[in-house]
Design a protein with these regions (language model features):
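Non-ligating segments of multi-cofactor redox enzymes
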Residues: 1-315
């Protein structure tokens, strides 16, 4: 019974911390607001991303499938050669932009830069770390051992592995931190012709997103271009937004926020709880080992059980 009691104590600690440890961002954390309602699917963001991150084009698969030569780039999804990807939603005759029925729309896939990243928690060698100031999830190739735990842990299937390389690395978007270090912004935001990809501080982007979902469909709104700090705008007709900001709560929140006129599940985005898997697992660990009470109690129970077993066998 005492052995069971020790086990129950441990289980009790696990239950009490299962809600997890919630993490917050610094006031200077940066991110991207992607507004699918004003995206035209031109893929200028993809081309710019490849150019400024030295990523090679992917054309072999499409050329092989279509028999057409000379296609510069057409990746199917995120890969070790593609850090962001515009995907198309279609329904019925796809005649109306931003319509769930018989319509079409676009969504952009890239690293979400989670507030509490599962990939960072899963990495055993801290090859993936979250920058304390910017919040960007950064990769250290020199620390990486190629275990690929981050790939399994990520709920968005973002990190990719260079299987074809002799010395492979993990590949993912880092919000063009090399450009930011020189005073620039992510290439996908700088070269987006409509403002669909918008750079800024996460707090400001959230404020902008909340403003947009309250807009009246059919009205005109001056959409900021490239970066919130620039002040450049482009007037456009407002689409019927879904009253939801994807990334505000998912998995504890993300620095990559999305708006759309189409339900996000139909765009291939996962439904996640408001708590990250990382916070749950770390909360359990911290709860169990806090003060070493549970391990000591468990050890005491096991020793008592062993003593009783030995005593009974000798008797």
């Amino acid at each position: 019974l005492k052995v069971l009691s020790a086990g129950a104590l441990t289980a009790g600690n696990v239950t009490s911390v299962f809600a997890g440890i919630r993490k917050t961002l610094s006031a200077d954390a940066v991110g991207i607001l992607y507004d699918g309602t004003i995206c035209i699917g031109c893929k200028a963001c993809e081309a710019a991303c490849k150019q400024y991150n030295d990523m090679p084009p992917e054309s072999a698969n499409l050329e092989k499938a279509t028999g057409v030569d000379g296609i510069w780039d057409e990746s199917y999804d995120l890969s070790e050669k593609t850090l962001n990807k515009i995907k198309l939603y279609e329904h019925g005759d796809a005649s109306t932009h931003n319509s769930e029925e018989n319509g079409f729309a676009f969504v952009k896939k890239a690293c979400m830069h989670c507030v509490d990243p599962d990939c960072v928690s899963a990495c055993p060698v801290t090859a993936l770390v979250k920058n304390d100031a910017t919040g960007i999830v950064e990769y250290d190739k020199d620390a990486c051992i190629g275990c690929r735990y981050c790939m399994v842990a990520c709920p968005y299937n973002v990190p990719k592995f260079e299987y074809a390389q002799a010395i492979p690395e993990i590949v993912k978007c880092e919000l063009c931190n090399h450009r930011q270090a020189e005073g620039g912004i992510p290439a996908c935001c700088e070269f987006c012709p409509t403002g669909a990809s918008l750079f800024g501080k996460v707090t400001d982007l959230l404020e902008e997103a909340r403003k947009r979902i309250k807009l009246v469909a059919g009205s005109t709104y001056e959409y900021p271009m490239r970066s919130l700090d620039e002040g450049d705008v482009s007037p456009k007709t407002v689409a019927p937004y879904i009253n939801y900001i994807y990334g505000e709560k998912e998995g504890g929140g993300t620095q990559y926020l999305l708006l759309s006129a189409i339900p996000f599940t139909k765009l291939g985005l996962p439904e996640l709880s408001a708590t990250s898997s990382a916070s749950k697992s770390e909360g359990i660990q911290h709860g169990i080992y806090k003060g070493m009470i549970a391990p000591i109690a468990l050890l005491g129970g096991l020793l008592y059980g062993a003593y009783q077993t030995t005593k009974n066998s000798e008797g």
